[in-house]
A protein has these predicted regions:
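N-terminal small/glycine-rich loop or linker at the start of catalytic domains
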Residues: 2-20, 76-90, 136-149
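Conserved, mostly hydrophobic/aromatic
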Residues: 14, 117, 173
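Metallocofactor- and cofactor-centric catalytic cores in central/energy metabolism, strongly enriched
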Residues: 17, 41, 55
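Catalytic domains of carbohydrate-active enzymes, especially glycoside hydrolases
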Residues: 30-47, 109
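Generic structural signal for hydrophobic
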Residues: 34-35, 69, 107, 130, ...
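A structural motif
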Residues: 40-41, 112-114, 170
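Active-site beta->alpha loop and helix N-cap motifs at the rims of alpha/beta catalytic domains
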Residues: 48-129, 146-159
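Conserved small/polar residues in nucleotide/adenosyl-binding loops
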Residues: 190-195, 199
């Protein structure tokens, strides 16, 4: 039996780039049925990054907007996920631990299933609390390996990082190529065999 491949739809920069098109919630809700009808997405990114700021610029209620955007996907059995900047939460600058913890409770209440956490420095100390907070809120914790190319950032480096995150309780591991410089061959090696399989051996 062949391995089933599931696709996740991620909207890059849709809400955080002032120079690009940013949608209102009524436009998002309108396009949701088309995304569902495609029948190929198991997950859809519904919030995170600068989503709330854009809502406010349009005079929308961020809390209401996220609930409206996640609702059609949940009804179709599609999971929703968000971006989380570890120490910064959903913001661009560090936030106190209690505020960061509250982010997860609010996002879960709004209908978000998965938190995709990353730290640009790959500092596990910044990611670890996110794993705990996500689980406490009833969310799936997906942790990212921020990919780059250097003598230090080897396959062993990323495999070791993934194993540490799994040990801390990460439910899933994500490869995040923020700068677009990850090499295809290297990315393949990060997954063969998977860190979770290596942990078992």
């Amino acid at each position: 039996m062949k391995k089933e491949i599931k696709f996740s739809l991620v909207f890059r920069d849709m809400w955080q780039s002032a120079g690009k098109y940013v949608p209102r919630v009524d436009q998002l809700v309108k396009v949701a049925p088309a995304i569902i009808e495609m029948g190929c997405f198991a997950r859809v990114e519904t919030n995170g990054g600068g989503f709330e700021q854009v809502n406010l610029l349009f005079g929308e209620n961020p809390n209401k907007a996220v609930r409206e955007w996640t609702k059609p996907f949940h009804e179709a059995g599609i999971q929703t996920h968000m971006l989380d900047r570890a120490l910064n939460g959903l913001r661009m600058s560090p936030v106190p631990a209690d505020v960061r913890k509250l982010f997860y409770k609010v996002k879960k209440a709004q209908g978000t299933d998965i938190t995709r956490t990353f730290c640009g420095l790959n500092d596990i100390r910044n990611i670890a609390p996110s794993i705990t907070y996500a689980h406490e809120a009833g969310m799936i914790s997906q942790c990212s390996l921020c990919i780059t190319h250097s003598p230090i950032h080897t396959v062993e480096y990323y495999t070791d990082m993934a194993l540490k995150l799994i040990k801390l309780g990460a439910d899933e591991i994500c490869i995040k190529d923020m700068a677009g410089i990850g090499r295809p061959v290297s990315c393949l090696l990060y997954q063969s065999p998977s860190p979770r399989d290596r942990q078992k051996s």
